[in-house]
């Protein structure tokens, strides 16, 4: 039997899988939204998918750019403006920022080494262990991916393609071979 990976190496592998999985889920939801749906507020106090994408792109870029060497709240970030859509915030531009921010995450996570866990990083001037900073970002990402999927499902209704196990299909799913359990992501309407 092979030796187990040290905790830090195993954890970094899981972080890579988690961020890629969250992005895959969000992308699977976003592809189901028409341009109108992308900008549609579900209610007066909630955010539309476009606002969530803009905010997540800003947050991920800020937290992960120069992750080990600069504060996670970059001076050029304006968090409040991430929730304000302007005519310049086309779907194509927001999705470009989305892709760029996730590339920053993927590149920085890939560059982390187990010995980096001895370092401390700051977010808004507050010290965080590497573990705390990564967990904070994973939690924030999962939270907003869930919002994107909920908004999408709310707007698309019966036209929504479920990205996990559909209601009433758990037994059928559990009976499948693990290699056959992949959920096919929908194409954009």
What kind of region is each of these model predictions?
Residues 86-100:
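A short, structured beta-strand-centered segment in the mid-to-C-terminal lobe
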Residues 110-114:
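A short N-terminal helical cap/helix-turn-helix that marks the beginning
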Residues 119:
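Active-site-proximal loop and beta-strand segments within enzyme catalytic domains
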Residues 59, 63, 97, 101-108:
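C-terminal ligand-sensing/allosteric alpha-helical core of TetR-family HTH transcriptional regulators
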Residues 2, 12, 16-20, 24-27, ...:
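Short, contiguous alpha-helical
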């Amino acid at each position: 039997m092979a030796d187990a990976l040290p905790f830090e190496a195993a954890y970094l592998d899981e972080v890579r899988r988690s961020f890629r999985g969250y992005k895959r889920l969000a992308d699977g939801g976003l592809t189901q939204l028409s341009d109108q749906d992308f900008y549609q507020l579900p209610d007066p106090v909630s955010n539309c998918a476009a606002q969530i994408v803009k905010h997540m792109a800003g947050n991920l870029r800020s937290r992960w750019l120069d992750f080990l060497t600069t504060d996670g709240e970059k001076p050029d970030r304006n968090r409040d403006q991430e929730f304000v859509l302007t005519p310049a915030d086309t779907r194509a531009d927001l999705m470009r920022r989305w892709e760029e921010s996730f590339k920053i995450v993927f590149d920085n996570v890939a560059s982390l080494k187990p010995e980096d866990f001895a370092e401390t990083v700051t977010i808004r001037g507050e010290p965080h262990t590497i573990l705390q900073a990564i967990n904070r970002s994973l939690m924030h990402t999962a939270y907003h991916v869930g919002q994107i999927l909920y908004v999408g499902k709310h707007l698309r209704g019966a036209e929504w393609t479920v990205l996990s196990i559909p209601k009433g299909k758990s037994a059928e799913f559990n009976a499948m071979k693990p290699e056959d359990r992949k959920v096919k992501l929908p194409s954009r309407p």
